[in-house]
Amino acid sequence: MSNYSGLNILKSNAKELAKKKGIKLTEALEAIAIDAAFSNYHELSSVAKRFPLEPRLMKAAFGETHFENVIFSSDVYVQFEMAVDELLSDAVASTNANGFAVYDLEPTEVQYDEEKGLLNMTVAFSYEGEQMPDHFFSGISFFLTANVPLIYRDNNWLIAEEGIEIISSDSNADPDSDWYDL
């Protein structure tokens, strides 16, 4: 079993709990299992080996019942929005719009690497602003697909160091203009 499997993450959490509360590791494992809605640690361990993506196990180990939900957790979503703001700042500066935000965020592909604790997610979304009054229309929306690498460290999901990569983009700008090419 790998370092970043759900079961190994829960074992690490149990070690920390045992140390923090001054209890035996077996007691900490039982407490974590019961807190995760399993009857005992043996049940949790058996389920983890047969069904590593079982929702109770996922929630206890990764904070979400499905990997697709990770992008919507508050910390990750804020990180994602900030990264998109930065990536698209030049393109946004060329529009006659402001107040851009992410809309219709949808994970389209999700893969978790238990060896590295790396969740590779492909997402589709729009990035939309509001037309500034008294300015010519030059586009207010970008339609994007991006790769979002996330790592799970210290019971938190973070955007990995390599950051978000935009893999496709389109805009509702004038098709004769080339300002929106990313």
Language-model features: where?
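Cystatin/cathelin-like cysteine-protease inhibitor module
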Residues: 50-182
